[in-house]
């Protein structure tokens, strides 16, 4: 029996910290169900080739579609937590924001992982790992004198997902 056996987590697919967080929870025994998007312009890895998909179940839903949202609501009805990494307001527009989910499952822990937080001057700006570590000053230490700073890894995303 694993530490998180019996816990059900819903993960809305994305890049970086959300999938890493879901992977770690699945590794610890939680049942993690990743909701993949049917079509996206994001450079997401093929679900079967994505290392962060390990130990997870997955389902492909178009959350802009009413029938898909009904299935989403059914999935969260007995879930313990949800992992979401979209810009502020995206899930609310889809009808699956925290208040929408609370009506279906008041005990659901709604975890949001965003680059710049839920409010503030950068909250609605898209961001990626290199943006976060540059603004934090970490990127400066990764380059040589008079050479470009090349990050060693996706440090900011990994830090956000753990």
Segment roles from a protein language model:
Residues 4-6:
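Phosphate-coordination loops involved in phosphoryl transfer and adenosine-cofactor binding
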Residues 11, 27, 31-36:
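Short beta-strand "acidic-cap" motif of Rossmann-like dinucleotide-binding folds
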Residues 46-52:
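Active-site-proximal loop->helix
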């Amino acid at each position: 029996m694993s530490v998180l056996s019996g816990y059900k987590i819903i993960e809305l697919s994305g890049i970086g910290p959300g999938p890493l967080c879901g992977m770690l929870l699945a590794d610890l025994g939680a049942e993690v169900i990743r909701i993949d998007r049917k079509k996206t312009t994001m450079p997401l890895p093929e679900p079967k080739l994505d290392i962060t998909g390990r130990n997870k179940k997955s389902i492909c839903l178009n959350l802009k579609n009413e029938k898909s949202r009904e299935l989403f609501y059914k999935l969260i009805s007995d879930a313990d937590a949800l992992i979401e990494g979209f810009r502020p307001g995206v899930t609310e527009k889809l009808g699956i924001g925290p208040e929408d989910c609370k009506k279906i499952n008041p005990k659901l822990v709604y975890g949001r992982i965003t680059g710049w937080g839920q409010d503030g001057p950068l909250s609605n700006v898209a961001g990626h790992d290199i943006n976060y570590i540059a603004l934090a000053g970490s990127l400066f230490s990764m380059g040589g004198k008079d050479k470009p700073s090349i990050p060693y890894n996706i440090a900011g995303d990994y830090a956000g997902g753990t």
